Each structure stands twice: as C-alpha cells, then as structure tokens.
Amino acid sequence: MATDLNIRTVMAVLVDKREKAAVEVQKLLTEYGCYIKTRLGLHDGAGQYCSETGLIILELVDDEAKHKELCDKLNAVEGVSAKYMKLEL
C-alpha cells in the first residue's frame, strides 16, 4: 500500500489515573502496534512527585478502520479520552 507523505494521522490519548488505566491502555497499544509508527508518552513527574495524568501522542499508519477501532477501544477504558485526526499539506 502506497503512503501519501503529505497526509498524516495523529491520535492524542489523555489518561487520567495512569496507574489504574495503564495496563489496559498498554494492552491495546500492543494489540494495534502494527498501526503505530511513532509513540510519545508525556506526564509530569520528577523525583517523589509523579502525576496521575498522562498524554500519549501516536502517529498512525495503514488501515484507517483500525485507527477508529483503536480509538473506540481506548475511549471504552475508564479515565481515557482518545481522539484522532488527519493532517494534510
């Protein structure tokens, strides 16, 4: 399948109560790993302080139906909000 480098699909995943949701989120990201080109995880944490919320940014590739499926499954996890969009030049 040819890839149009002028079109990118990006998903943002906001996770509240990371320790509670992390296992299920990781399971889904592993399940859909073939559709994730880039993954960046961000949270506030240093030393003794570690934030309960986190942000995951994904660059998705290939099957758009799988992107929607992943988004829907992530949104079904309590404390998780996911949205994706296409960016075009």
Question: What are the language-model segments listed below?
Answer:
Residues 1-89:
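Long, contiguous binding/interaction regions
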